Amino acid sequence: MDAVAVYHGKISRETGEKLLLATGLDGSYLLRDSESVPGVYCLCVLYQGYIYTYRVSQTETGSWSAETAPGVHKRFFRKIKNLISAFQKPDQGIVIPLQYPVEKKPSARSTQGATGRRDDPDVFLKTP
């Protein structure tokens, strides 16, 4: 998962929301660890000032899936990157297609951000 640029690891829901709201762009998204369900991830998407969160998990066989709107057929993907690519298209069961990845910026110092704290959210928005 660490190879996925939009994966922010163990950040809080509040931190994820702040990062997305700071972009001000509908369709901005990131992935983070779920705070309530171990081993599950959250795909967080900004739309009209609200953050929509979809649980993403890996099956025992290694496939990836996301919880989407009721009535939408559940799909499975071999790689998390394939799941993200699929949700960049319209009508996939999420509020808006994924458009603007909020990537975790690699730190110049391997584990510390600009303030010297390990939890510093060094991020940047990648626009198409």
UniProtKB/Swiss-Prot annotation:
Function: Cytoplasmic adapter regulating receptors of the signaling lymphocytic activation molecule (SLAM) family such as SLAMF1, CD244, LY9, CD84, SLAMF6 and SLAMF7. In SLAM signaling seems to cooperate with SH2D1B/EAT-2. Initially it has been proposed that association with SLAMF1 prevents SLAMF1 binding to inhibitory effectors including INPP5D/SHIP1 and PTPN11/SHP-2. However, by simultaneous interactions, recruits FYN which subsequently phosphorylates and activates SLAMF1. Positively regulates CD244/2B4- and CD84-mediated natural killer (NK) cell functions.
Positions carrying N6-acetyllysine: 89
Location(s), subcellular: Cytoplasm
Keyword Cytoplasm: yes
Gene responsible for this protein: SH2D1A
Biological process (GO), any one: adaptive immune response
Residue ranges of the region described as Disordered: 104-128
Keyword Mitochondrion set for record: no
SH2 domain location: 6-102
Taxon lineage: Eukaryota, Metazoa, Chordata, Craniata, Vertebrata
Keywords: Acetylation, Adaptive immunity, Cytoplasm, Immunity, Innate immunity, SH2 domain
Stretch list, region Interaction with FYN SH3 domain: 67-92
InterPro entries (alphabetical): SH2, SH2_dom_sf, SH2_prot_1A, SH2D1A_SH2
Biased amino acid composition, Basic and acidic residues: 116-128
Name of the featured protein: SH2 domain-containing protein 1A
Domain of life of the source: Eukaryota
